[in-house]
Amino acid sequence: GVEQIITVDPHTTYMMREIYPKYIENYDIKVKHYLEILSQKSENLAQFRAGETPEAFVIHDPCVMTRDLGIVEQVREVGGALGIKMVEPENTKMDTACCGGPVEYAFAHLTHQISGIRIGELAGLKSNILVSCPICLINLSRYEKSMGIKIWDMGEILSDLKSC
């Protein structure tokens, strides 16, 4: 049987790690977000550098990843090991502001209001924004053209690593 699942989405990690065990009898699968695993091996990442990426990013912490899972420093550890410079916005880490994505299907207008506030805060610091959640990526990417910014996912950066 399956012993461990590695996820790329904090929402999936939360559901499979925190909710499924409450409802599925004998559920004993270990569930980890990929950044939890990579941060434990960050010394191995030092031999790589991010490929064609900007010099610095403003970091957006996914709300579910930080508040519900406690995954906060891992993205910073992985980014730091790759030589990525990260700028912290005012609302960061456990106090991060949501991108609005989790409520999109029920309250689309509310999602746009929330994401508009968050993207204004982030874009005011840097034009390159780093996320580590596919929902944040999709939700914040809608502002790329109108605001002249670029939203990057950590997985995207990891897929283009170069040896030092």
Regions found by a protein language model. Give the residues of each.
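Iron-sulfur cluster-binding electron-transfer modules in prokaryotic oxidoreductases
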Residues: G1-C164
